[in-house]
Structures are given as C-alpha cells and as structure tokens.
Amino acid sequence: MKALDFAQKPIIGMVHLKALPGTAGFSGDMGPVYEQAMADARRLVDGGVGALLVENDGDQPYESKLSTPQVAALAAVASRLRGAFDAPLGISAAFNDYEAALSIAKAVGAGFVRIPVFVDTVVAFCGVIGPAAPMALKLRSRLQAGEVQILADVQVKYTKMLLPATTIEESAKMAQSCGADAIIVTGVSSGDVPPIEAVKRVKGAVTAPVLIGSGIARENVREQLAIADGAIVGTTFKRDGCIDEEKVRDFMRAYRGEAAWN
C-alpha cells in the first residue's frame, strides 16, 4: 500500500471504468472493462502521473449505494490495477458509497479513497445525501484501515447545498475536524476549474492539504497549484473517451516546467 505524498503536489489520474455488472449500460462482458482500465492506467503512468484513482464512471445514472455486482466488479478491477502498477491507488465508488470505497481499499491494498459528500448535506441527481463522515470514520476503524487516506470533497460538483448559507470555509473546517486527510475543491461540473478565490479561501481555512478536483489543465496548472497541494485530473487527459498519453505528457511537461514549489 502506498499513501499520497502531498509535499510533492501529486497529480492523481482518473481511471474511469466502463459500465459495470448490475447497471443498465453493462455490455455483459467484463473483458472490455478490464482492457480499457489497464490501458488507461498504463497511459497515465507512462505519461508521468504519480497516482491513480479508479471510479465507476460508466455506471451513470448513479445511485447513492453500489449494488453487490458493482462492488465485486470495482474490487476486481482495482485488484488488477494494484497488482500491475506501483503508483498509489485510490477508490471512488460513485456517487457517495463510502462503505464500498473503504472496503475495497482495505481488501486490495489501495492507499486512499474519495468521498464526495463527507460533511455537507446536498441535493444531487440521486436525491438528498447527508454527510458520510460519522459512518465512514467508524467503518475505517472497524476495518482497521487507518492507513487508508480519506480525500473529502467540500460543496462538491453536480450538487446543491441544502443549507446554502454554509460557506466553503465552514465546510472545509468541518471536514478537517472530522478526520479528512485532504480537502478537495471542485468547480460546478467535471472539466470546470474552481475559482482561484475559492481555492485560496479553503487553503486559508485549514491546515490539511487542499486538492483541485476538477478542471485542471496545462493552461491553469501554475496558477492553481501555486496555491493547492495537488490535483485530480480526468477530463483534460482524454481524447474520444480514453486517456491520451500525449495529452498526459503535455500536461506533465507544463506541470514540471512551471511548478517552482519551493
């Protein structure tokens, strides 16, 4: 198991899976799921990305809990990725299934999970979702998985706050106090970068590492990572739905050339 080193401002590449068993879009064959996952992960790693985050992106429309077939399939793919690559591996069980994410992480030896709704109460396409923090922390303790890092979104993309007066600083402070190992700030949707002012506000409110969770690109990597402590990158690496290694390399060249962190 490898943890994320936030001092290195990691770039975490998304491995978006095709539809899994138990969902409407599943083809009936796990072969293409494995093949695309392994190919995308290989392109990310060969392109210079330092960590991987696997997610059941193809299972849309999401529910708040994964079915047993989905959990089994996500675990199977994650296990193959864990065995094939030395990079830190994370689990995201979309939309907010902390139980599946933590259980899979413990079972396969993944180093971190992403929990989109950790302390907020939000309205999403799958209904009203409450904070996962109390149950997630109890489960992590029961699994004896304290080594699994929790990356917690605040006021996450594709949702509306049920209590809109809550500031993003308040959400970030609450996430930190509830045990998040890092805080994720997103724009309103995938591919949409969060306002730099929002990143600064969160960074000023907490001591935990702050990650950019959407919209990071070679054109804004310097501005965003001059403030933030790393980024999760998916959309900007893709061409025709798959990871494009040259796009990864192009981004990483910009990242390395512009990032004078010290």
Question: How does the language model describe each region?
Answer:
Residues 96-109, 171, 205-233:
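Catalytic cores of alpha/beta
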Residues 13-14, 63-91, 131-152, 194-217, ...:
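Alpha-helix-loop-beta-strand connector modules within alpha/beta enzyme cores
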Residues 1-28, 136-145, 262:
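N-terminal amphipathic alpha-helix/helix-capping segment at the start of soluble metabolic enzymes
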Residues 16-39, 89-97, 152-169, 212, ...:
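Active-site mouth loops of central-metabolism enzymes
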Residues 11-15, 52-54, 89-93, 113-115, ...:
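Hydrophobic faces of well-ordered beta-strands that scaffold small-molecule active sites
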Residues 49-73, 120-125, 180-194, 238:
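Glycine-rich, proline-tolerant flexible connector loops at the mouths of alpha/beta enzymes
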Residues 108-126, 178-190, 214-217, 227-248:
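Glycine-rich phosphate-binding active-site loops on the catalytic face of alpha/beta enzymes
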Residues 17, 24, 104-182:
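Conserved anion-binding
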